[in-house]
Amino acid sequence: MAISKITLAIIVLLLGFTEKLSALSSSCNFPAVFNFGDSNSDTGAISAAIGEVPPPNGVAFFGRSAGRHSDGRLIIDFITENLTLPYLTPYLDSVGANYRHGANFATGGSCIRPTLACFSPFHLGTQVSQFIHFKTRTLSLYNQTNGKFNRLSHTNYFSKALYTLDIGQNDLAIGFQNMTEEQLKATIPLIIENFTIALKLLYKEGARFFSIHNTGPTGCLPYLLKAFPAIPRDPYGCLKPLNNVAIEFNKQLKNKITQLKKELPSSFFTYVDVYSAKYNLITKAKALGFIDPFDYCCVGAIGRGMGCGKTIFLNGTELYSSSCQNRKNFISWDGIHYTETANMLVANRILDGSISDPPLPTQKACKLTKK
């Protein structure tokens, strides 16, 4: 009799273990993605709001300008591809918009904090306000049309969607231009506070599944290396003080996410270490097939100071910016943004969970368990 009880207990344990494995191995089937950020994930907002992001941007994949500051796809594009969802339509784009499977509120030049120093007026707080308005209007129209308007997200998608945030680079890069390392570090708590307010507002609106990208190694951006030639470098050639600030920002961000996991019931947070993935591109550039980690592909018509995609008239002649032919051999597209090849390498690390905490693939980001 004792043997049969032991056997039964083992069977029960095995069944429970099998069920847990099955749950973890299955995909989350996120029906939508709502993204917030800056030009690293802007799929056309700044183009719709201020002016077109001109060619040769987009040439590698889209064959045309597609509102992205890159030669092709961004990290967010690879994420939606992996989730078998369409590319995200910018919230600010009203022509041919389809929000069935989410929307993109990221806008180039945006900061976390509201500041006039940022290129874009659409700081993170504004992006969240836009989302709240978007959700309210969507629910209203959905009810008015009895769910027949198929270009809008389904009413239950908002609680089942994946919410991705990739923003903070501009807060640090702009601040570095007129602050010392220690002065800039002193602003981080306020930046994190603004970020936290945004997350809590999204949670209040029903968001439950969050993928939080930390900031990359801003001190490795070629345009900043050119702007600050006298600043001390790290062993790989990046601006050491600015990367120190980025590391401190990421440390405080991760601590805050750990805290929010406890504060917000039923929330599922994935902290993604984008910094390590992007810094790895720099430190292992040659092995990954890149020529020079600090060179960039899209250059101005009169040198590297004009800007990618811009044109000027010089002595009555219109001059165009151009891009290199060997785009896959470059990390940086224009001195600020990444090439599609670099974006893909970083995205692969995000999607397989190797730089995430907890270390689960993006497709399984809803399977996290509370500790």
From Swiss-Prot:
Organism whose genome encodes this protein: Arabidopsis thaliana (Mouse-ear cress)
Keyword list, A-Z: Glycoprotein, Hydrolase, Lipid degradation, Lipid metabolism, Secreted, Signal
Name the UniProt record assigns to this protein: GDSL esterase/lipase At3g27950
Alphabetized CDD domains for the sequence: SGNH_plant_lipase_like (cd01837)
Catalytic residue positions: 39 (nucleophile), 334, 337
Annotated EC: 3.1.1.-
A Pfam family this chain is assigned to: Lipase_GDSL
Glycan attachment sites: 82, 143, 178, 194, 315
GO terms for biological process, alphabetical: lipid catabolic process
InterPro entries reported in the protein's UniProt record: GDSL, SGNH_hydro_sf, SGNH_plant_lipase-like
Family: Belongs to the 'GDSL' lipolytic enzyme family.
TM region positions: none
GO CC terms, sorted: extracellular region
Signal peptide coordinates: 1-23
Annotated localization: Secreted
GO molecular function: hydrolase activity, acting on ester bonds
